[in-house]
């Protein structure tokens, strides 16, 4: 088996435009506020975790902006940071591949086109419409930017897409299809229809009078998730290739797990069956290391948090620290796995664990996992796990360990 390592990371979220946002996350700050990106009239939820002050011209030329939805722009921003962080500038990256990830893709662009149809303006539909919003164009733009001619894939497995993208990159490298991969999960789902759709499912928090305290993973008073946007990116390479070019190494990807609940289209299995299977598979593949920290899916919804806690406890007991950063940056859907993998890796590298903001206490029936209620310094963590679950009952988990020869 080839050893697969992480040599670069990047992210953009509601608390910042690069990996330095990790500091804001560990300080317990929250990026949730009233929505400014779209009209909120008639919506049951009027707040979200928006990326503030993002200027797409920092990533693409002005004339190119109209050719890509915001989710592509955010993804390119994170990808550029990971590319630079990995020291790939000036290196021939034609042997690299790309895996993009999203769940909703360019929904805002699509909504705008539908509005034009309703207004009778079909003749004014842009020729760039389709390539500006379809899901695989994130990976397409990344490969174009960096000249990466290896496999170009896209995962669209709802909220597990980012984690599945990491797994697909691992598999591609193991099979020798290329020497490096860049994984980019990105989402820009804050639109009227998207907010209304999730609201109709009673999936969103409705604490419009208190947005900062709305997302409260594992807390007994949680009432739904908070929509978020952003992107995360990781550069993965075979150890041989990374060493050959003298790359700095963040962590080693040692295990992954995938499963399906086969239970319900949106509700997780009541005993955490699929989640447990994915968690256990990732841990077993990694060689059963001592997991020191888990960045949980932790959506702040009634059932996910309850059943996920049960799965974690059954697999690992109360040994690992557990938190969910969705309390600060919202639920970024298909981007969550990539963003949270970056956060998990940085937590292990810097020995600082992100706290659960807004957490007070869990309901009595929740499994007694070791929740991180405040910023925690823990230097003894050698392995971390990040997991995500999506509609359709799809589950994915990955294990990263500190790198050593």
Residue map of PLM features:
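Condensing-enzyme catalytic core mediating Claisen C-C bond formation in acyl metabolism
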Residues: 2-7, 29-34, 209-293, 405
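Glycine-/small-residue-rich "gating" segment that lines the acyl/pantetheine channel
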Residues: 119-126, 167, 171, 188-244, ...
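Active-site-proximal alpha-helical scaffold in enzymes
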Residues: 75-87, 135-187, 225-247, 332-353, ...
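Acyl-CoA/ACP chain-elongation machinery
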Residues: 177-223, 256-270, 296-305, 319-369
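Conserved beta-ketoacyl condensing-enzyme motif
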Residues: 6, 19, 29-157, 186-195, ...
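ACP-dependent fatty acid/polyketide chain-elongation machinery
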Residues: 1-64, 240-252, 342-356, 396, ...
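Conserved small-residue
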Residues: 8, 25, 79, 98, ...
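Flexible, low-complexity linker/loop segments at domain and module junctions
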Residues: 1-6, 93, 286-290, 367-405
